[in-house]
Amino acid sequence: MPSDFFLQPLDGGPRVPVGPGQTVIGRGPLLGITDKRVSRRHAILEVVDSQLRIKPIHRNPCFYQSSEKSQHSPMETQVWSQLHPGDSFSLLLDKYAFRVFSAESEVEMECTLRNSQMLDEDDILSEMQKSPVVNLPDKTTGASQLQGSPEITKTKCPTIDPMSSSGECRAFSEHQPRPTQRKRILPAWMLAESLSDQSLSTPAEGGDKDVIQRSGKAGTCEDRTPGNTSWHGKKRLSPSGNSKSVSAEQDPGKKCRKADQEGPGVSSENVPESSSSNIVKDPDVDIVKTNKQKDGILIEELGEVSKHKAATKPTTNEEGESCARVQSKSPPEKSQGCHPESSSAPSSPDALHTDTADPVLGCSEESKVRRTACMYGANCYRRNPLHFQHFSHPGDSDYGEVHGTDEGVIGDRPECPYGASCYRKNPQHKMEYRHSALPARVALDEDDDDVGQPSDDEDEEDYEPTDEDSDWHPGKDDEEQEDVDELLKEAKSSLHLKH
């Protein structure tokens, strides 16, 4: 039989149905209360004639609150009190409050909710029917404005100057697609550089001599064709009106470093005077600069290879001859590194330092300190480059020369106590100790009876016998010998008696 009443906890939780008849409520699983202040038999609920009533049976009172009042009032014990739908009661003053619901009240509440929802929907529909009449002009005007805005953007944005940056133009330009081609605007420092290039290119009208002198000061290469070098500088003068441009056609491996360092000087001659006010021709300057950077990288790599070859060439005679050979086989700039006073415009200090240091390294290879031999030899498993710099291994030119003989080792070392007869095979031991042959001992005379006595070259005063220090007594040895003989005789006699 379905229950007519339900208890809804105000603190949250599932509803508790109240069956017909009496129901004891309190601490337990029915209401989910575990507080010790609530008794297991705290009150009794009873359903009589479709009405619910409560009777407190514990000394701690229960509290009642009607749907019309906002305060809890204590109920008398052992007295029945009616509970109507919507009323609430609590087992304690501040906790465990429950509200009473009935099935009929639930149906009535659902009906009222449906009615209220229907009324709300009717109100909304009536408002919606009235609102289009009032709001249609606004919507139509808004739509017309939205439709007209693309036309405004199309008509207004192209007419606005691109240099003027205003907030309205930016807002309209966001809707407009970006053009495929855009005019390039160079920064101020590039414009200043182009003007300086033009000012440098104007004195080129004086003649070919001025151009050649200026290119020499700027660091361009002159025509040099030595027998053993592969450096070729080609110059070509192209007369064009009032000005003459000098263009150096050089391969990536045949371009001098000075021309790369003095980039503005060369670019000033390549830029004609007609490009004084045009900004469109400025990308050519960028192309020239990128080509120069690529050529400079290749030149530096080739320069390092040539320096390495020049530094590693063997020197057969004196240091002066080897330096002269390095100068003759190196490019012209390398010879300028050996003799800086001969060059009119030296290059950067770093390049000059490296050029002057490489021949010195090549000349000083003869006086290189030999490395010590590794104690592990061919069985060495180390791969550290520093280890190979300090120690030599089998296959190296200086391996085996350090510890092969004791005479070739430089430095003072202690003498091995075993000398030449040392049986140790550790090369580290041979490097740390000398193994020279011990001097032959002086042969003693066969007729010499003074064995164990001090030699003649020592002082006789140190070995003079004295009565005080001597422990020798003449009579003691004879007495000891007699005692030994007596003991032997006694032993023999005892043996004969036993047999």
Swiss-Prot record:
Zinc fingers (PBZ-type) by residue: 372-393, 414-435
Residues covered by region (Flexible linker): 401-411
This enzyme's EC code(s): 3.1.-.-
Enzyme class name: hydrolase
Changes after translation: Poly-ADP-ribosylated. In addition to binding non covalently poly-ADP-ribose via its PBZ-type zinc fingers, the protein is also covalently poly-ADP-ribosylated by PARP1.
Pfam families (alphabetical): FHA_2 (PF17913), zf-CCHH (PF10283)
Amino acid composition bias (Basic and acidic residues), ranges on this chain: 251-261, 281-292
Residue positions of motif NAP1L motif: 463-487
UniProt note: domains: The PBZ-type zinc fingers (also named CYR) mediate non-covalent poly-ADP-ribose-binding. Specifically recognizes branched poly-ADP-ribose chains generated by PARP2. Poly-ADP-ribose-binding is dependent on the presence of zinc and promotes its recruitment to DNA damage sites. The KBM (Ku-binding motif) mediates interaction with XRCC5/Ku80 and XRCC6/Ku70 and recruitment to DNA damage sites.
Similarity comment: Belongs to the APLF family.
Protein name in the entry: Aprataxin and PNK-like factor
Record gene name: Aplf
